[in-house]
Amino acid sequence: MDSDSKEAAAVIERAMSSVPLSMKVYAPDGNYPEGYNYWGYGTSFNVMLIAALESALGSDGGLSAVEGFMSSARFMQYMAGTTGLAFNFSDARETTQSFPAMFWYASKLGDPSLLWNEKIFLTREDTHFTAEEERFLPIILIYGSRFDMKEVTPPVSKIWTGHGKVPVALIRTGWDKGEGFYVGIKGGTASANHAHMDAGSFVFEAQGVRWAQDLGMQEYYSLEKEGVRL
């Protein structure tokens, strides 16, 4: 594409007109209807597109200003409980992971507290990455170099709420692992992408234990082999 400026321009223009359509899911507050894991998948590519446009063209064409997109980083931070498990509504698993896109958000917003969960995850002895996750790691090198991780402190806030197609309320009494209480509850509809019939489901954690949990996802193949058309 770098040898054909007309073709490159056409692709970029089409992206600039179509990508905002998919970004409407972040409105109004940033809670992502598809849940924990799919936030990492979709938002990471969204961040890379914005970063590439800013680097190459000097502007992202307003993509980062789409309603709810920048607020979504804080939503994602709250989705990890004090046990180290995720609020796994919709097609999501309990296991938490690092999201390199958070380093871009922290840099863009000038808010290193967004990296608190990343700091915890990246310093764990059992930290590992799948091949799918490894492809995003360069984002940490690029944007993480702008922060002294030793000085990253937890957010001051303890409550996060979001409206929209799948509204959520996420409440905690502390940010250190095993500290205090954590409650996550969701509303919404089963018609959202990757949604379950789980409106009203919640997780509750206290003293480092998850006492109430969402059943989470069922592996797709186990359904497809029984003739369920997903």
Language model segments and positions:
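Generic structural "secondary-structure junction" signal
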Residues: E34, F89-D91, S222
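C-terminal, non-catalytic macromolecule-binding modules
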Residues: A212, Q218-L230
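Short glycine-rich loop/turn motifs that provide flexible caps or phosphate-binding loops at active sites
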Residues: D29, E34, Q207, L215, ...
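Active-site lining segments of carbohydrate-active enzymes
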Residues: M1-N37, I140-S157
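Short, flexible micro-motifs
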Residues: P33, Y38, W211, E219
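Carbohydrate-active enzyme catalytic cores, enriched for enzymes
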Residues: Y41-L215
